[in-house]
From Swiss-Prot:
Catalytic-site annotation from UniProt: 48
Domain of life (superkingdom): Bacteria
UniProt-recorded name of the protein: Uncharacterized isomerase CA_C3446
GO term, biological process aspect, one: biosynthetic process
Pfam families associated with the record: PhzC-PhzF (PF02567)
InterPro entries, alphabetized: Phenazine_PhzF-like
GO cellular component: cytoplasm
UniProtKB keywords: Isomerase
EC numbers: 5.1.-.-
Entry-linked SUPFAM superfamilies: Diaminopimelate epimerase-like
Family: Belongs to the PhzF family.
Length: 302
């Protein structure tokens, strides 16, 4: 039997094609097997591809699964933006809140219609603070990134943080150093197995752009992504990290900032992050961004 699927290529965290972070999206994924989804993700070769399935439960509107070229992951920020952008276009949605089932739980997504286009706001998963990377593991990490201890920001612990898909937070002093990073991907992959975390988010806090607080780069070679252009599940946890370690300035229990990523690889995009704070601790993280359709096609399978 011939099966036809709606296939999109969408750039997230940008309004300009060929920038931001590209994601594949299949909006009518019912009937696809795990094997087929993995093959499709490998063929498209984006850092993630999102597959939208019909809801089978009144608690959520859609079930979304995310695959890198090599494996399934619980959730993905830019592919969530892409998936719900495509879904909003197909269904001509008005401003609304929808819920999607993911590997990180059932989470809300806000679809904001403005000027005949959409902005997507993703509420991320449970905030979790993991291990601090120190000692021999820290030495291995610095060697893998080809940076020195003197490059690190003081009082910024190297720590695993998650809002659904964990990342190692690594603060460095210089934007110039950030843009020149040339990691040893093989060593990073091996270290991931030891620390049980696949992504490394190296960031600089800068005042060079008055509108941008964070510039970053994210490496995840252990799951087939040497460098991810713009990463929702790195900047979201970073917001929680900055609040938790009292490195953030905010008013009225809301910490907001913008992060720019992808500059070093020619795919820059901007993420807006909002952290709700209660009793000086982060309790909820949202990320938001724009998107643009690069192409729409039809995938035909027998």
């Amino acid at each position: 039997m011939i099966r036809k699927y709606n296939l999109y290529q969408i750039d997230s965290f940008t309004k300009e094609k060929f920038t931001g972070n590209p994601a594949g999206v299949i909006t009518n994924a019912d009937g696809l097997t795990d094997y087929e989804m993995q093959k499709i993700a490998r063929e498209l070769n984006n850092s993630e591809t999102a597959f939208i399935f019909s809801s089978k439960d009144e608690r959520y509107d859609a079930w979304v699964r995310f695959f890198t070229p090599t494996s399934e992951v619980p959730i993905c920020g830019h592919a969530t933006i892409a998936a719900h952008y495509a879904r909003a276009i197909e269904n001509n949605l008005e401003t609304s809140r929808v819920y999607h089932k993911t590997g990180a739980g059932i989470l809300p997504v806000d679809v904001i219609k403005e000027n005949d286009d959409y902005k997507i706001i993703m509420t991320q998963g449970k905030i979790e603070f993991g291990s601090v990377i120190d000692g021999e593991k820290k030495e291995k990490l610095l060697r893998a990134l080809n940076i020195e201890k003197s490059d690190l920001l003081e009082n910024y612990k190297i720590q695993i943080v998650s809002t659904g898909h964990s990342k190692v937070m690594i603060g460095i002093k210089s934007l110039k150093t950030l843009n020149k990073l040339q990691p040893n991907y093989d060593v990073l992959s091996k270290l991931s197995k030891i620390i049980k975390c696949n992504g490394y988010y190296v960031f600089a806090v800068t005042s060079e752009d008055s509108d941008i607080l964070i510039h970053g780069r994210m490496f995840a070679p252990a799951i087939g992504i040497n460098e991810d252009p713009v990463t929702g599940n790195a900047n979201g946890p970073l917001g929680a990290y900055l609040v938790h370690h009292k490195l953030a300035c905010y008013d009225n229990s809301i910490f907001k900032f913008k992060a720019k990523q992808g500059e070093a690889i020619g795919r820059q995009g901007i993420i807006e992050v909002e952290v709700r704070v209660d009793k000086e601790e982060p309790v909820e993280v949202k990320i938001s961004g724009n998107a643009v359709v690069v192409f729409k096609s039809e995938l035909v399978l027998n």
